Amino acid sequence: MSRYRGPRFKKIRRLGALPGLTRKTPKSGSNLKKKFHSGKKEQYRIRLQEKQKLRFHYGLTERQLLRYVHIAGKAKSSTGQVLLQLLEMRLDNILFRLGMASTIPEARQLVNHRHILVNGRIVDIPSFRCKPRDIITTKDNQRSKRLVQNSIASSDPGKLPKHLTIDTLQYKGLVKKILDRKWVGLKINELLVVEYYSRQT
């Protein structure tokens, strides 16, 4: 299944706020579809919905998300927590959380078009896994800086998670450490996502 490129508002009406996909939010009490079924069907629907929220927020294909679930499942820690850490430490998501891009698709474009450096080297792979002490910057030219300027100016410094810092004048971000669960930027029950995939095998 390919990455979703359709109407974004359609997805947030069904799944709720997906800040990585779009800055728009569904109206209070709008069409967040709540069809109640009995027993197993309702439980399956809830698990599927949580999985879809995770996939669309981070802009992943079904295959990519499944691969992350498998990697997380091999860790000694909680599978759900490791899954969120893997997704949050992707370069495209780090750019989004730093405020250098307004959405994850926008961050992905910055990376694909070679505007972003990690520790002084161009990285053009959005899924690149960042680690503590990594320094993320734009290329030292006006075009690259201009592309992130508006996003930084309109971002809310109060929403910057504690595992990141940013120098807005130099367009430079720092990954201080692996994030804690409470800093994840999406309202999600990751255990239901893990359960969804465990029941598919």
From Swiss-Prot:
Source organism's superkingdom?
Answer: Eukaryota
User: Is the Transmembrane keyword given for this protein?
Assistant: no
Location(s) in or outside the cell: Plastid, Chloroplast
Record bears the keyword Transport? no
Q: Where is this region: Disordered?
A: 20-39
The S4 RNA-binding domain extends over 89-150
Q: Name one GO molecular function term.
A: structural constituent of ribosome
Q: Which SUPFAM superfamilies match?
A: Alpha-L RNA-binding motif
Output the GO biological process annotations, alphabetical, semicolon-separated.
ribosomal small subunit biogenesis; translation
UniProt-listed SMART domains: Ribosomal_S4, S4
Keyword list, A-Z = Chloroplast, Plastid, Ribonucleoprotein, Ribosomal protein, RNA-binding, rRNA-binding
Query: InterPro entries, from UniProt?
Result: Ribosomal_uS4, Ribosomal_uS4_bac-type, Ribosomal_uS4_CS, Ribosomal_uS4_N, S4_RNA-bd, S4_RNA-bd_sf
One GO CC term of this entry? Answer: small ribosomal subunit
Listed transmembrane segments? none
Kindly give the HAMAP family that the UniProt entry links to this protein.
Ribosomal_uS4_B
**What does this protein do, in the record's words?**
One of the primary rRNA binding proteins, it binds directly to 16S rRNA where it nucleates assembly of the body of the 30S subunit. With S5 and S12 plays an important role in translational accuracy.
Q: How does it assemble?
A: Part of the 30S ribosomal subunit. Contacts protein S5. The interaction surface between S4 and S5 is involved in control of translational fidelity.
Q: Member of which family?
A: Belongs to the universal ribosomal protein uS4 family.
Protein name per UniProt? Small ribosomal subunit protein uS4c
Organism lineage: Eukaryota, Viridiplantae, Streptophyta, Embryophyta, Tracheophyta
